[in-house]
């Protein structure tokens, strides 16, 4: 059985990147929550 995590920078950015977060309402909520918490990194 192969491992489930097969790293790819492109897929990582597209799925969890800043622009991907901004594209949806839920993603914007995620960013707002992370800002409120004072996270150093908001997204991948």
Curated annotation (Swiss-Prot):
Keyword flag Protein biosynthesis: no
HAMAP family attached to this UniProt entry: Ribosomal_bL34
Matches recorded under InterPro entries: Ribosomal_bL34, Ribosomal_bL34_CS
Gene Ontology MF annotations: structural constituent of ribosome
Family to which the UniProt record says this protein belongs: Belongs to the bacterial ribosomal protein bL34 family.
Organism this protein belongs to: Bradyrhizobium sp. (strain ORS 278)
Cellular component terms (Gene Ontology): ribonucleoprotein complex; ribosome
One GO biological process term: translation
PROSITE patterns: RIBOSOMAL_L34
Protein keywords: Ribonucleoprotein, Ribosomal protein
Protein name: Large ribosomal subunit protein bL34
């Amino acid at each position: 059985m192969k491992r489930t995590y097969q790293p790819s920078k492109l897929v990582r950015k597209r799925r969890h990147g800043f622009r991907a977060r901004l594209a949806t309402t839920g993603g914007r909520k995620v960013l707002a929550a992370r800002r409120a918490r004072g996270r150093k990194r908001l997204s991948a």
